[in-house]
Amino acid sequence: REKIGVMFGCFDYSTRAQLADGTTEKIGKIVDNKMDVEVLSYDPDTDRIVPRKVVNWFNNGPAEQLLQFTVEKSGGNGRARFAATPNHLIRTPGGWTEAGDLIAGDRVLAAEPHRLSDQQFQIVLGSLMGDGTLSPDPRGRNGVRFRMGHGADRVDYLEWKTALLGNIKHSTGENAEGARFVDFTPLPELAELRRAVYLGDDGRKFISEEYLKALTPLALAIWYMDDGSLTVRSEGLQQGTAGGSGRIEICVEAMTEGSRIRLRDHLRDTHGLDVRLRQAGAGGKAVLVFSTAATAEFQELVAPYMAPSMEYKLLPRFRGQSRVVPQFVEPTQRLVPARILDVHVEPHTRSMNRYDIEVEGNHNYFVDGVMVHNSPETTTGGKALKFYASVRIDVRRIETLKDGTEAVGNRTRAKIVKNKVSPP
């Protein structure tokens, strides 16, 4: 008595594999012609998407059933499509998962262009703590829209920030009061950041410990310029107050209560700043108040990253130090989670043949942007038990749940696969 061997699934003829030159080709054509091509493949050692040779081709005959997947993506018509056998392994945030165990709403890993440099990502982080927002792509694509907006008296500052993001497509708008807004093209690389920051339904921003640890002085400067104010106590004319003195207040009303406390503690513990929270004005808005000494220390930290039009928020001795220049990078393909929009059984056609390829080294490739396992190997199984009494519920990890970037749990799905008295 032998266990049933396992074959790791296949795709229909028309499923398009992504080639190393950026084009796509039907997997059936690659197999039938044994095309000597390189495909895109994920290298887990370098965390990069790289070209790899196809080293074997498989036509595994007719399939009993094929599942048609539709997955969100940022380019083209906003949809990735492929058809796979139910046992083909698809990469998800939680690991490899059989196609038949995935449903609409689950997320898979897909290759999407990343356009932001490290400097530009810091601008986004700082802006989100201030006046910036992230919103879903209005057309339902994989990506979120970053928006910056300021009043008519701060247009120069908005233009300075926009220039630092100058290689990202954007549009500008203006309201009746003269406030100006800049909306950037949806960026898939910011989707996880949006999920981490907008956790609740009240619109307040959740700033985690990991978010705070990622902040550089540039991000802190953006946050201060967006939402901070300086009350000058002394212009520095007296010998005892040379260089001037004052107190900073930064509004944190848009953050959750816990985020405000984490931010206060971060500034204290990481930068040694004497800051406290208080309620300001008739509306009782939450603000962070800096002591006179902390104000000087903070301004020394952020002075090299201030926009020229915002130097009025600096004490006189810290002005004129700005040295920020745009830092652009070429787009690179990176893995991001993408939501499954639809899964259904493909209607039977005259040709239901199953196709697959073997990829050198990494043993994975991409079909219309979605990461899948290559499947040449089979297992012969071995001796089977009369009854599978030890396995009655199949529990699979679907994805990792995060608080910011910290893993706090797993999303799982349980499926009854055998009862304790059923033979194999």
Swiss-Prot record:
Q: What is its main location?
A: cytoplasm
User: Its Gene Ontology biological processes?
Assistant: DNA recombination; DNA repair; intein-mediated protein splicing; SOS response
Q: Which SMART domains match?
A: HintC, HintN
| Pfam families for this protein | LAGLIDADG_2 (PF03161), RecA (PF00154)
Q: Where in the cell is it found?
A: Cytoplasm
Give the InterPro entries listed for this entry: DNA_recomb/repair_RecA, DNA_recomb/repair_RecA_CS, Hint_dom_C, Hint_dom_N, Hint_dom_sf, Homing_endonucl, Intein_C, Intein_N
Q: Which UniProt keywords apply?
A: ATP-binding, Autocatalytic cleavage, Cytoplasm, DNA damage, DNA recombination, DNA repair, DNA-binding, Nucleotide-binding, Protein splicing, SOS response
Gene Ontology terms, MF aspect: ATP binding; ATP-dependent activity, acting on DNA; endonuclease activity; single-stranded DNA binding
After translation, how is this protein modified? This protein undergoes a protein self splicing that involves a post-translational excision of the intervening region (intein) followed by peptide ligation.
- Top-rank taxon of the source lineage equals Bacteria
| GO cellular component, as recorded | cytosol
- Tell me the protein family, please: Belongs to the RecA family.
* Protein role: Can catalyze the hydrolysis of ATP in the presence of single-stranded DNA, the ATP-dependent uptake of single-stranded DNA by duplex DNA, and the ATP-dependent hybridization of homologous single-stranded DNAs. It interacts with LexA causing its activation and leading to its autocatalytic cleavage.
Protein's name in the database: Protein RecA
Q: What is the lineage of its organism?
A: Bacteria, Bacillati, Actinomycetota, Actinomycetes, Mycobacteriales
